[in-house]
Structures are given as C-alpha cells and as structure tokens.
C-alpha cells in the first residue's frame, strides 16, 4: 500500500552484514530497477559492496531454490527475493504468485534466515513501474532490520 504507515523502524546499520539477492529475470527491465534500487539502499545502509552477492534466475518460481541454496551456505545474514509477476489472461498468474510467495516463506522458516520478499504481484506493467524503485529500497531496509533483529534474538 503506497504511503502506508509503517511505524518507526530501528536504526538500520548494515555495516557488519552479508546479504544475498536473488533476482528473477522475467520482466527484466522492472527487476533490474528493483535490483538497482535495492543494492543502492543496501550500500547506503552500510553494507559493503563486496558483501552483497547478486544472482539471477529465469523467473519467480526459480527464486526459492536459489534462496534455499544460499541459505544452506550459512554465509549470509539476510536474503532478498526480487521479481515481477504481471497478471495475464490465464490462471498462471495466481499459480506463480501464490507458489513463489509460499516457497520464499518456507525457505526463510526452514533455515531461520530472514528473507525480504520483493516479488511484485501486479495487474499491469504500469503498476510494476510505479512500485519498482520503492520496493527495491524497502527490501533492502527489511533485510537489514531483520538481520539485526535475528542477531539480537540469538
């Protein structure tokens, strides 16, 4: 929801964090914008460029498998899922949106690693472009906040 009241987040310091991003290439121009915004925000929050791993996969359904492989490495404090699913004329939209979202959550819970899910699910390309920049930055902030919280809780 645009302009939603998100409350006040803790101070975000990513200087000691290692973060990995999995970007779906389907709807590539949009997901490139998501990735660019996300990486810029991670660096603004103090995450060193050398501590940001960025991989790509064909589409949203492949994101979770790459996240799982990264989670199993135990080298990252947080993971980020980036993608863009635009509604078409068939049920395929619901399938991809539901299954990719559930799989990302499952990986996070099974491996105890925070995953910021910025796989956009939109009605049309205009909605995707309207959200790409902010959602990329949001994903970075969520990843840093949750990585720090998990450290505090351990």
Swiss-Prot record:
Record flagged with keyword Transferase: yes
A molecular function (GO) term: 6,7-dimethyl-8-ribityllumazine synthase activity
Intrachain disulfide bonds: none
GO terms of biological process kind: riboflavin biosynthetic process
Classification of source organism: Bacteria, Pseudomonadati, Pseudomonadota, Betaproteobacteria, Burkholderiales
EC code: 2.5.1.78
Catalysis performed (reactions): (2S)-2-hydroxy-3-oxobutyl phosphate + 5-amino-6-(D-ribitylamino)uracil = 6,7-dimethyl-8-(1-D-ribityl)lumazine + phosphate + 2 H2O + H(+)
Protein name as it appears in the record: 6,7-dimethyl-8-ribityllumazine synthase
GO cellular component: cytosol; riboflavin synthase complex
Highest rank taxon of the organism: Bacteria
Amino-acid positions noted as binding (2S)-2-hydroxy-3-oxobutyl phosphate in the UniProt annotation, renumbered to this chain: 89-90, 131
Pathway per the UniProt entry: Cofactor biosynthesis; riboflavin biosynthesis; riboflavin from 2-hydroxy-3-oxobutyl phosphate and 5-amino-6-(D-ribitylamino)uracil: step 1/2
UniProt keyword annotations, A-Z: Riboflavin biosynthesis, Transferase
Chain positions recorded as 5-amino-6-(D-ribitylamino)uracil binding sites: 26, 60-62, 84-86, 117
Similarity comment: family membership: Belongs to the DMRL synthase family.
Active site: 92 (proton donor)
General function of this protein: Catalyzes the formation of 6,7-dimethyl-8-ribityllumazine by condensation of 5-amino-6-(D-ribitylamino)uracil with 3,4-dihydroxy-2-butanone 4-phosphate. This is the penultimate step in the biosynthesis of riboflavin.
NCBIfam families linked: lumazine-synth
Gene source species: Leptothrix cholodnii (strain ATCC 51168 / LMG 8142 / SP-6) (Leptothrix discophora (strain SP-6))
HAMAP family reported in the protein's UniProt record: Lumazine_synth
């Amino acid at each position: 929801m645009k302009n939603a009241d998100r409350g006040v987040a803790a101070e975000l310091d990513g200087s000691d964090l290692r973060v990995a991003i999995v970007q779906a290439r389907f709807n590539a121009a949009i997901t490139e914008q998501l990735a660019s915004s996300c990486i810029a925000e991670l660096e603004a929050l103090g995450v060193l460029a050398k501590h940001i791993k960025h991989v790509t996969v064909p589409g949203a359904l492949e994101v979770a498998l790459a996240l799982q492989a990264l989670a199993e490495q135990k080298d990252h404090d947080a993971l980020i899922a980036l993608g863009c699913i635009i509604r078409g004329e068939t049920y395929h939209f619901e399938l991809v949106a539901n299954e990719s979202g559930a799989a990302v959550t499952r990986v996070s819970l099974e491996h105890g690693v925070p995953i910021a899910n910025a796989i956009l699910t939109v009605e049309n390309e205009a909605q995707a472009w309207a959200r790409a920049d902010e959602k990329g930055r949001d994903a970075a902030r969520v990843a840093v906040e949750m990585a720090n919280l998990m450290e505090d809780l351990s």
